[in-house]
Structures are given as structure tokens and as C-alpha cells.
Amino acid sequence: MTVIDFSKSEQYTLSIRLSADGFSFSIYHPQADSDYTYITYPVNKSYSLTANLKEFICATEAFKYSYRKTNILIDTPRFTFVPFELFEDECQDEIFHYNFPPKDNETILCNILGKSNVALLFGVNKHSHQLLHEHFPNARIFSCVSPVLEHFAIKSKEGNCRKLYAHLRRDLLETFVFDKGKLMLCNAFNCKKTADRVYYLLYIWQQQGLSQDKDQHHLSGEIENKEELLAELQKFLRNIFIMPKPNIPFDIQTLLTCE
């Protein structure tokens, strides 16, 4: 981590991450991986998202500068995806509400993911979206899932086997199945117990017809009780790999794949 020279802020990329668990932002130089800073900001859980966001923007000196690019990541479980060849812009709200009931003051946004060949739809609080647009008019807004999905799409082309990727967070398990770059499944489960995670992962493995001997299972994120999780999975699967945990959130780290 390094001190940013804000007189040269237009050479840097600002990435803001908004989650119910807390806010954070990263400033980095696209041509220098080591030239970055990462700052976290706590939220008051008795306040609304928009109220917390107003405080965050006002309290953060770094947001007063102009940047080469500004990215905003929204952490929300309300997301779904559509194969790009079936997607129509004018139907995005209708498609989204096939999967999630309508919610007051929600705006539906879309990320076109070229490497995964899907359109990812996600919901954002309407007032927060307006506030973000006012303060960061040129920002690109992503679901936190989007850069992770694109990163795995690239990695899945390596080798000649299918891959199940599991990204673990405190209360959430995000799963992605790829067949040499082609997305076969994307799903998320609210769970934090090791037994529940093992159940969902093995269920997906079976339902997708993956090979215990040939295909691969990759784990990333906050892997609590890692030894227990590995021991249970290794009873059934041969090729299990754990990705190194980065110093910053995995979705911010992989955001470069959406550049």
C-alpha cells in the first residue's frame, strides 16, 4: 500500500465498494500493481443505505478529486443473469422481476459481461443510485458478482476440464460452473456453516454431472474452518484448489477484468 499523489489523481482509478457490512474504496494506478491504497469505512446499521452513503461521501477527502476512471461496486443478493443472445434492454425490469418480487424505490441496472456472454441484472436503491450519479456522474456501476464472474470466465479456459468455482463470504456462498469458458451455472446461497457449504457444493457437482477425477473445484474468499471444509470435500472430490486470499476484496481485485 502506498501514499497517493492526488495532484496526479487523473492517472489513477477509483473503485468504491458499498455493502451492508461496510463501505470501502481503493485508488490504484492501472500500470503499477503495487501503487494503490485501500481504505475501509464503517456504516451505522441504524441508518439507511442512503444516509450512510451521504456521510461516506462527505467524510472522504479522496472523493473531491477527478480520476481516470471511477468504478462503483454494489454488494447485493438481488441479481440474476440472462444469456446475452436472449437479452433485450426494454425487458430488463420484467426479466428481473421473474426472479425477485418488485421492491419499492429500486432501480434495475445491467452489466454486459462480454467474457461470460451474459447480461447481469441487479437491483440498487433508487435514492442511493441518484446520489451516486450526482457525485460521480461518469462512474460505472457494477454488481460485486460481475468482476468475479468475468475473472472466472477467463481462468476457466485454462486446461481441458470443467470447473466449479466457489467464492465464500461470511454468510454467502457464490457458485459458478464453467465448461472451458462457457458459463453453465451461477447461483448464490445464504449459508455460513461448513456442513451447509459442503452440501450445496456437492449438490451442484452432482447436478452438473462433473467428474470426481477429471474436473476441478476452486475455492476463493473468506474460507472459515478451511481444514474442516477441505477434509469433507476431499472425501468425494480429487482436484480441489484454494486461491490465495488477497489484501483487498476479491471483487475489487478482479475488477480489472471488466476494464
Feature-to-residue mapping (PLM):
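Hydrophobic/aromatic-enriched cytosolic interaction surfaces used to assemble or bind macromolecules
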Residues: 1-259
